[in-house]
Each structure stands twice: as C-alpha cells, then as structure tokens.
C-alpha cells in the first residue's frame, strides 16, 4: 500500500473515532466548563497509539512522519478536541534530535503511551539561565503547560543553548493557568524557584538553530492542519444550519448571496489544503521546508479564522451563543493564529528568508 493511501486511511480512522467519541454536543458542553483537557478522551487516544505516531519505531513508536501527524492534527481541529497532542509531538522531536540514549530510554516510552503529557516552550522564547546546578526564572505562554507532567524549556548553560526536561511536580516548579477565550486548549506560565538541575535534565542539541527551526516547522504544520480541520468543520455545520433555518418562508440556504459566500469559503479552504499538504510532504532537510511550513501556517490560520467569523454571521443572532459551535472554532482559530508566531511575525521571517535566498 502506498504512503498516500496509508495517510488517507489514517485520516479516515482519526475522523471516524472523533466523530463518535467527541461529537458536537460534547464540544459544546465542554466549552461551558473549565477543564484543562479531556482526560477520558486522552486515555482513549493514548490506547489507540496516537501520541506514538511520530515516535521512531526503534523507540517503540509508529514512526509515521509529518504527513501522518498533520492528518491527526487536522482531525483534532475538525472535532475541536481538547487534547494536548502538540506539546507531546514537539517533545518527541526534541528528544529524538537532542536527547542522549539514556534520556530517550527514560522519556520516550511515556510520551508514546500517553502516560507523560509534555509541553514545549516556543523556540522564540527568551531562554532560562542555568546557574550551576540551580534554575530560576519564569516562562510565559507555554501551550499545554497546565496539563503537562513533563516540561521542556529552552535554556542557556555556560553560554551554550540547551533544553531542559523538568518534571512538573519537581520541587520549586509551579504552573499558573492563563485565561483563554479558546476553552479547548490551555496555556500557562511556568515559574522555577531554585529548581535542582543535573545532567539527566539537560538536552544538548548539536545544532541549536537547526533544532529551533525544526520545532517551529513541525508546530507550524500542525497548527495549519488544525486550522484547516476547524475551518472545514465550522463550514459543514453552517451549511447544515442553512438547510434548516427558515426566513421569509424559505430556508435561508436557498438565498443566492449566502450560497456564494459558502462557495467562496469552500474554495479558500481547498486552496489552503494544498499549502498544508505541500508543507507536510516536504523532507525536513529540504532548504524550502521551513519556508513552506511558515507560509502554510500564516495563510491557513488566517483563512480558518475568516471562515469561522463569517460562519457566525451566517448563523445570524445565534452564531455566537454557547448552544452552537461556530464560536468554538473562531476562538480556536484565533489562538492558532497567535501560537508560534503571529501572521505579521511570520511574514517578516518569510521575507527575510526569501531575501536571503
């Protein structure tokens, strides 16, 4: 079976499972609460091996690669499922690239089976400073930090860039959840007060810049795929609503002006899919891999937010009420836009890359 067919089968299985286990009714009910993640759903997807998707086969994972993880994130975005998958995926990539044999042996199995939930600070964050064997400082806006059991944080030690793998329950570590409009995910700040650090906690990358770029590439593709899934989901929900909502004695979906708006959104999302698939299909060592990922992220997240925003309008007055799903997807789309570089930041980075080429 070809890789393309394998990815299609995987994507179908992801969507079938989430449509059964996380239907819209659950998404709406969850959005009204204050949970940090769906623990029962996480246990289910962990049993199915989803966190192990990008873990190498040599370390007990599935080794499926970026196309498979993009398909997974698209399905998660479609369902607006509150799962801390991105932090786990980035932690796997970080360990595979910079971890010692002992560190991989210690940490990858927990990431693969879902018993360890990870968060990874953004590559652009100011690094912490390791002073001897002690760590002090604060890292803000870390995705999945409130639910993580293992924290992966950028740092410097003796002037060299390193990453730290710190247990969330280590003495001196505290995490504070930040308020978010998007209730399907969590972000928090991590405070470290005289935290003891030894060699088992320190990951030393051979090429820190290349590693930062690879983490950014993977995050950009995942967020673009998530946005693509969310954009399609909110459009499908809106089309269903247009077919049943009546005004002036007719279903509003029969109005040509609304048909044109839906068609425009569908066309925009299909074009966005091409960007995601192109970026996910590139080899990580390709000179254009990061450029393709950043291009996809800045464009697709914007398109998804625009689609979700207009779908609220197409729903009319109920569009932003808690009983309907459009607001969930708009909030998720706006967070996707902001994570790992806003559109303006990424456009500046893209311009610099093109100028240097």
Where are these regions (language model features)?
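Cytochrome P450 C-terminal beta-domain/meander region
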Residues: 125-136
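Alpha-helical interface subdomain recognition
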Residues: 1-79, 114, 134, 214-357
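A short, Trp-centered hydrophobic/proline-enriched beta-strand micro-motif
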Residues: 113-123
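A generic structural signal for well-ordered coil/turn residues at beta-strand boundaries
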Residues: 91, 114-116, 147-149, 160, ...
């Amino acid at each position: 079976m070809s890789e393309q067919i394998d990815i299609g089968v995987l994507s179908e299985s992801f969507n079938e499972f989430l449509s059964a286990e996380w239907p819209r009714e659950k998404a709406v009910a969850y959005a009204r609460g204050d949970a940090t993640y769906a623990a029962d759903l996480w246990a289910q997807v962990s049993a199915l091996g989803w966190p192990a998707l990008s873990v190498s086969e040599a370390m007990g994972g599935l080794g499926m690669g970026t196309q498979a993880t993009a398909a997974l994130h698209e399905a998660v975005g479609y369902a607006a499922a509150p799962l801390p998958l991105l932090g786990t995926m980035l932690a796997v990539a970080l360990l595979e690239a910079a971890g010692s044999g002992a560190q991989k042996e210690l940490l990858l199995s927990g990431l693969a089976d879902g018993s360890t939930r990870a968060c990874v600070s953004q590559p652009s964050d100011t690094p912490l400073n390791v002073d001897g064997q002690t760590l002090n400082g604060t890292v803000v806006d870390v995705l999945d930090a409130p639910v993580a059991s293992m924290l992966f944080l950028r740092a410097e030690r003796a002037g060299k860039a390193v990453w730290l793998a710190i247990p969330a329950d280590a003495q001196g570590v505290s995490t504070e959840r930040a308020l978010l409009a998007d209730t399907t995910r969590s972000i928090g700040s991590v405070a470290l007060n005289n935290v003891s650090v030894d060699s088992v906690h320190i990951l030393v990358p051979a090429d820190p810049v290349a590693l930062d770029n690879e983490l950014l590439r993977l995050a950009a593709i995942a967020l673009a795929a998530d946005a693509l899934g969310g954009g399609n989901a909110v459009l499908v929900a809106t089309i269903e609503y247009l077919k049943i909502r009546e005004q002036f004695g007719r279903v509003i979906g029969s109005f040509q002006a609304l048909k044109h708006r839906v068609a425009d959104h569908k066309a925009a999302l299909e074009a966005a899919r091409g960007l995601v698939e192109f970026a996910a299909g590139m080899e990580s060592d390709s000179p254009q891999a990061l450029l393709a990922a950043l291009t996809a992220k800045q464009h697709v997240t914007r398109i998804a937010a625009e689609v979700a925003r207009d779908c609220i309008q197409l729903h009319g007055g109920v569009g932003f009420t808690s009983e309907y799903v459009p607001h969930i997807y708009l909030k998720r789309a706006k967070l996707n836009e902001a994570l790992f570089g806003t559109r303006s930041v990424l456009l500046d980075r893209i311009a610099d890359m093109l100028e240097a080429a």
